[in-house]
Amino acid sequence: VLFRSVLAELGCRNTALGFVAGETGAWLERGLAAQGITTDFIHLEQGMTRINVKIKAGQETELNGAGPDIPESAMEQLEAQLDKLAEGDILILAGSIPSSLPQTTYERLLARLEGHGVHTVVDATRDLLVNVLQYHPFLIKPNNHELGEIVGRTLTTDADITAAARTLQEKGARNVLVSMAGDGALLLDEKGEVHRIGTPKGKVVNSV
C-alpha cells in the first residue's frame, strides 16, 4: 500500500491488488479511494484485514496483527488478475507471505508471469527474496541488513554492499536497489553500474 501511495503522489497510474476482509478491509479501501488510488482487491468472506501498530515511547515497538486465511480459490482469482497484465507492465510484490499461504507463493506468481514481458519488483526478506531470483526479477529491494543476512556477512562500506549486490545479480536479479535508512540508497543496475544517493537531512518523525 505504501508503494501505491508514493506512486500516486508521483503521478504514476497504478492499481493495488491483494486481499481484504471485514470492516478493516473496507476502511482500507475507503482510505485508498480518498487518496485517488485505484484498487481491485479480492474480498474474502471471513476474517479481518490485519492492523499493524507502531508505538513510539523512547524506542519504537511494532505490533503486527495476523491477517485472514486466504483460500486457494482466492489465490486463483489473483492469478486470473495477473494473467491480464501486458508486456511492459510492472508488478510489485512486497512484504511477507500471509501465514495461511505457502512460503513459495511469490515463486508461484513469478513462474506464472515468466516469459510474458512483465517487469517484476520484489521487496521481501531472506528466502522469500533469494528463491525468486531464478525468475530474473527486474528489480529487488533489500535493505543493507537484509542483504548482509543473505550473503552471510556484515556490510560496512559501499564496496561491501556493491559486492553483495553483485552476488544477487549473478543469481538472477537484473537490478538491485539497497536501501540504507538514513544513509540513503545504492543501486546496482543491470549494466553493472553503481548509483549512490544520500538522504535529505532533517529530524526523523517516524520510520514508516
Enumerate the predicted regions with their spans.
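Small-residue (G/A/S/T)-rich helix-start motifs and N-terminal tracts that mark the onset
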Residues: 13, 17, 25, 34, ...
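Conserved beta-alpha-beta core of the PfkB/ribokinase-like small-molecule kinase fold
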Residues: 90-161
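Conserved phosphate-binding/catalytic loop of the ribokinase/pfkB sugar-kinase fold
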Residues: 44, 54-87
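Substrate-binding N-lobe of the ribokinase-like
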Residues: 1-48
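Conserved phosphate-binding/catalytic region of the ribokinase-like
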Residues: 112, 158-208
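Short acidic/polar active-site loop segments enriched in Thr and Asp
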Residues: 13, 88-89, 138, 174
